[in-house]
């Protein structure tokens, strides 16, 4: 359990998630380190040799490894609607933003992501 300060200065407790994320190439590989306290087991496509891979290859890898794809790319959104899960997809809808913005978004929606991960019906979650 982590204790961090919320925006209002109040103490907020965050429990690490068992949810494992696969960060797509349009997100910084640095996010893996930045989010390791709340999303341990997170990896980036570069870490597993999938940099510049076809969407189908990333999709298949995530499904086989039990990972949730996190991307700013709408192609995964479309695949999610067509094929369902696994894998689940989190679509970051922040446009042109910093790595810190993406990190803050994933931290702010930690509880939503855990609920999404545990939802047997949910395949797709849009954030931002």
Which positions does each model-derived feature cover?
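C-terminal structural segments of small proteins and small subunits
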Residues: 87-128
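Ligand-binding "clamshell"
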Residues: 79-88
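Intrinsically disordered, low-complexity and often Lys/Arg-enriched segments
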Residues: 1-19
């Amino acid at each position: 359990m982590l204790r961090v300060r919320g925006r209002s200065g109040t103490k907020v407790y965050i429990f690490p998630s068992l949810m494992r994320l696969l960060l797509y190439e349009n997100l910084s590989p640095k996010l893996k380190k930045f989010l390791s306290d709340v999303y341990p087991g997170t990896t980036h496509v570069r870490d597993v040799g999938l940099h510049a891979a076809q969407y189908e290859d990333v999709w298949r890898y995530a499904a086989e490894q039990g990972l949730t794809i996190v991307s700013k790319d709408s192609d995964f959104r479309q695949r999610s609607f067509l094929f369902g899960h696994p894998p689940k997809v989190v679509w970051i809808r922040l446009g042109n933003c910093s790595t810190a913005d993406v990190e803050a978004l994933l931290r702010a929606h930690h509880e939503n992501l855990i609920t999404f991960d545990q939802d047997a019906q949910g395949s797709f979650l849009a954030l931002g």
